Structures are given as C-alpha cells and as structure tokens.
Amino acid sequence: MKVKILVDSTADVPFSWMEKYDIDSIPLYVVWEDGRSEPDEREPEEIMNFYKRIREAGSVPKTSQPSVEDFKKRYLKYKEEDYDVVLVLTLSSKLSGTYNSAVLASKEVDIPVYVVDTLLASGAIPLPARVAREMLENGATIEEVLKKLDERMKNKDFKAIFYVSNFDYLVKGGRVSKFQGFVGNLLKIRVCLHIENGELIPYRKVRGDKKAIEALIEKLREDTPEGSKLRVIGVHADNEAGVVELLNTLRKSYEVVDEIISPMGKVITTHVGPGTVGFGIEVLERKR
C-alpha cells in the first residue's frame, strides 16, 4: 500500500524529513496590505527572505487557509502518482479552517483520504507524521496508524511550547496596545505559550530569554518527568542562536535521543513574529 502523508505549511516540517519520510506540505497563504498574496512554500531561501521582509514591513500581513480546491488538486495529483491512500495531518481546527478544507475536499475525490486534526501547531505536527510513516514502513495498516496516533495524542505525547520575544508584531497584529508593546520591549518581556487541547494558551510573561527558556521547560515538566526520553524539533523565526540555547538547556534535564532544528514558515512567523523560539516534543518514554 502506497501512502502519501500530507501536512500543511504551519507544520514547520524539517526539510530533510520531507524526502526521508515522504511528507509533503500544502501551503497556507500570506496576504499583504496591498492585496498581494503569496504561498507559504517550504523552501529555505524563501523563508529566510521572508524574515527580512516582514521585519521591514510597516504592517503585519494577514493569513489565509488552503482552499478546498487546493486540497482537491493535491489529492488528484497523488492519485496520478499511483498513491493508494492520502493521510493528512493538519494544524488544530481551533486555530484555522485548514482541517475543514481538507475534509470537504476528501469527499470530492475517488482516492481514500484520511484527515487527522492534530490539535497541534508548528514543530509538533511533523512528529506524528513521522510516527505514521515508520509504522507504515513496518507493515501497519492505515487503520492501525490512525488508532495509534489517536492514542498518543490523547496521552499528550506530542507538545508545542514556545515564547514570543518581540512585542512589535503583537502590536502590529492588534493583539496588544502600543503602550503594552513599548513596555514589553523595554523590559525585554517574553510571552510563553503552549498548545492545550488545540488552543494557543499564553501561560506566563517573564523577563529575558534565559527565564523564558526555563519557563518552557517548566511547562514540559508538568506532565513529563525529568529524565524522560524525548524526540525534539527545535523551531525558530530567525533566531537560531535562541533555539540552540533552548535545546542545550533541555538536554540538562531530559534524555533527548533525537533532535533537529527547523525554521518557522511564513504563516507561523506572521502570527508570532521574528525572534520566536520553541519546540515540538514527542515523549518517547516517560520516566517512572
């Protein structure tokens, strides 16, 4: 059985994983103030160029989801490439309509399509995608894969935790007032967030990167004891030094058996701003 795994561009999937695990990415869109729209393609040079452009932009662009037709074209393309099944893992349905577009399109094609609402975002999404691919390569059926992913998501084995370091984008996006943004930047305030039951939840404000990193690991510690085995995707929006420091600190408390760094794409960066640092976590084994 030949299965194509498809994620949306908010997954921030590591570039090397796309070929290694046969994971494809369908873009969301960035819409600039003058009406120009551009796809959130998973291309290294495009992403680096976007970081520069959004820093220089006078306003924060808006974003939009893939259309039903976008998904339909992808499904039909995979059928032409002789895939038997398509497995789609999307950004949380509580954060975007992408899941709904994927489901509606699946009803209009004659290739089996299974759509999973991961209730996750960013670097957490490629982790269940990799689990699915490894299970399929070991002979699992698509039904067994879906059951395992459901079990592990309910067990909170996949997590997305990060911090926002620049209030300018929260101000430009209308999320905080100019005064709050001024004070936040002046005091080097970092806003720590995580995905909980599919929703983006701010849980702490701290001063400086070091305290923000400590707050991220403290959030992980709530249900994952120190010494547990982890697979980690470190993500960042034009702040690789920050994510390296985060991973170095994480390794002091956890057994990180696999790690990779992946830049955040255009759409995620639009919402959180350059400078953001975080990680997608897969708990492989919780220490008793």
Curated annotation (Swiss-Prot):
Native organism: Thermotoga maritima (strain ATCC 43589 / DSM 3109 / JCM 10099 / NBRC 100826 / MSB8)
PANTHER family with a match to the protein in the record: DEGV DOMAIN-CONTAINING PROTEIN DR_1986-RELATED, FATTY ACID-BINDING PROTEIN TM_1468
Assembly information from the UniProt record: Monomer.
List of residues binding hexadecanoate: T63, S96
Pfam families, A to Z: DegV
Keyword match Repeat: no
Record-linked PROSITE patterns: DEGV
Protein name: Fatty acid-binding protein TM_1468
Keywords: Lipid-binding
Gene3D superfamilies assigned: 3.30.1180.10, 3.40.50.10170
Protein biosynthesis among keywords: no
Any coiled-coil regions, as ranges: none
Job of this protein: Binds long-chain fatty acids, such as palmitate, and may play a role in lipid transport or fatty acid metabolism.
MF term (GO), any: lipid binding
Span of domain DegV: 3-283
InterPro entries documented for this protein: DegV, DegV_C, DegV_domain_contain
